[in-house]
Amino acid sequence: MDTETVSVEEARRPRTSTGFVLTSAFASGVGVVIAVVIYHLGLAVAGAIAGRAPVLYHNEVLFRAGGSDLALAGGAAASLIAGAIFLTLYPASRRYDAARLTVLWTVLHCFRQGFTPLAVLPFTDDSPLSRAWSTLGLPAGVEWVVSAAGTVGLLSVALASAPAFLAYASRQSLISTPSGRARFTAEIALVPGVVGPLLAVPVFLPDGGTGLVPSLPLFGAFTIATVLAALGTRTVRIGDHREALGWSWLPLAWLVFFALVSQFLFRRGVLIPPSLRAPFVDSM
């Protein structure tokens, strides 16, 4: 049980600045965009290796040639690999700022993008991973083992992110009680986890019936488990003289950059591998 007493003066202070909540929301949006782009790049690269002449668009990958559906597993594989790479980079920075927070969100969304297809494998027949799985001809029931592994992966990511988010508190009193920890993670993780994917919508418009945009509101659902995990997370210690975090333009700038690249580059359809003479479908 927590025994630290919070002074009346500290209790009356604003718990988390609105600016930093907005910064976290835009950082979450950047993480969503990077995760989706990596997923699509994984599909495109695997398709190119399989000789399926892929075209990378802003919201999907289309194959112009037939071939093995095993290439459709490339998206989930690339997402998990990217999540692991970003995870190794995350501790390299000792500053708790907008850049580090953006990397954290990117890690979480990459793992979510990779583990979710595994978790829902037995329940879908037309998803890319399901179609890739059907080519393997494995015994019935194995898909449930894969689903369990994906579910455990999703829960592990959600639970492990609780102390990572709590470490952004500007003072110990903010996270010294279970209710304080739940409140802080709700503000910095749950709200941005829901709002961030919505901020990413312009990057993927027009949707063109791909179903990506309607699915975006569900991308941050895992943060519900993060808030619940924060209730019992007591190991995070905040150093003295930590500067309170506020608004940063960095995640917004990155989101605008990705939106411009998406609309003026990927929307035209990029051939994979690209050709210098005719890099886009509309230039062939």
What label would you give each PLM region?
Residues 43, 47, 82, 116-120:
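Alpha-helical transmembrane segments and their lipid-water interface positions
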Residues 72-87, 150-157:
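Hydrophobic alpha-helical transmembrane segments
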Residues 16, 21-26:
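An N-terminal structural lobe/cap that precedes and organizes the functional/catalytic core
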Residues 27-79:
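Small-residue-rich helix-interface/hinge motifs
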Residues 96-284:
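N-terminal low-structure segments adjacent to metalloprotease catalytic domains
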Residues 78-80, 86-104:
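Hydrophobic/aromatic-rich structural module bridging two neighboring secondary-structure elements via a short loop
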Residues 1-18:
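Short, Lys/Arg-rich, polar N-terminal cytosolic tail immediately upstream
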Residues 24-35, 191-194, 254-255:
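Alpha-helical transmembrane segments
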